[in-house]
């Protein structure tokens, strides 16, 4: 399955919520009619079946993190193999992706931009250049911007934007050195309450 390259706001309208696919400079409701689904006439959403609700939740989370269908399925299988709550395990696996950590540290204004930075070898983990967006970051890993990439305008702009957002408790960033530490894997209480991971577990349990 190819990665979606179309309008980002169309995906947010499809899911009926902000997927944080844009930089966040403007509120999403000033950019599009979030309460209507995409299409020529922007029909309002009908009542979904239980399966439909579960599917939409899975698609929402998958799109927030920019993960393809096969990748997402593999993450779920790994989460189910681990001890503890499968839904929480799933979110923690997604949160430890390198592209997501780069976004959380404020080096990129969106996860898609973070994925580009990683792919273009602008990110260093523990002193080694890593260009795999799905690379798993572990507690106490150092994630920094490569020296020759530190003057990129988009990174500087992203850091300025990150100053306006609430900073995640599980990362620590030196914005002058462009060097951060992934202090710990976030707990469920740290993450968005707008995600209902139990619906995803129910979907895959069918």
From Swiss-Prot:
Keywords on this record?
A: Ribonucleoprotein, Ribosomal protein, RNA-binding, rRNA-binding
- SUPFAM superfamilies attached to this UniProt entry: Alpha-L RNA-binding motif
Q: Which residues form a coiled coil?
A: none
> Per its UniProt record, what SMART domains does this chain match?
Ribosomal_S4, S4
Molecular function GO terms recorded = rRNA binding; structural constituent of ribosome
Pfam families, alphabetized: Ribosomal_S4, S4
Gene Ontology biological process terms in this record: ribosomal small subunit biogenesis; translation
Question: Where does it sit, as one GO cellular component term?
Answer: small ribosomal subunit
The UniProt record lists the S4 RNA-binding domain at 96-156
Purpose of the protein: One of the primary rRNA binding proteins, it binds directly to 16S rRNA where it nucleates assembly of the body of the 30S subunit.
Record's subunit section: Part of the 30S ribosomal subunit. Contacts protein S5. The interaction surface between S4 and S5 is involved in control of translational fidelity.
Q: Which family does it belong to?
A: Belongs to the universal ribosomal protein uS4 family.
Q: Which HAMAP family match?
A: Ribosomal_uS4_B (MF_01306_B)
The protein's name in its UniProt record: Small ribosomal subunit protein uS4
Name of the gene this protein is made from: rpsD
């Amino acid at each position: 399955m190819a990665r979606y390259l179309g309008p980002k706001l169309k995906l947010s309208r499809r899911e009926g919520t902000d997927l944080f696919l844009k930089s966040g400079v403007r509120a999403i409701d000033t950019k599009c009619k979030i309460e209507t689904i995409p299409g020529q006439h922007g029909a309002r959403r009908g009542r979904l079946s239980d399966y439909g609700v579960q599917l939409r939740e899975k698609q929402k989370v998958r799109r927030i993190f920019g993960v393809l269908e096969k990748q997402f399925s593999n993450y779920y299988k790994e989460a189910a193999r681990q001890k503890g709550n499968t839904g929480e395990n799933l979110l923690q696996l997604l949160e430890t992706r390198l592209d997501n950590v780069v976004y959380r540290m404020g080096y990129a204004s969106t996860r898609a931009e973070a994925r580009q930075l990683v792919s273009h070898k602008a990110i260093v983990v523990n002193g080694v250049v890593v260009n795999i967006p799905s690379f798993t970051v572990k507690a106490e890993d150092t994630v920094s911007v490569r020296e020759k990439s530190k003057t990129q305008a988009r990174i500087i702009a992203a850091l300025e934007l990150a100053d306006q957002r609430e900073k995640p408790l599980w990362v620590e960033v030196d914005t002058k050195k462009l060097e951060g530490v992934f202090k710990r894997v976030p707990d469920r209480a740290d993450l968005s309450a707008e995600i209902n991971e139990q619906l995803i577990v129910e979907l895959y349990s069918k």
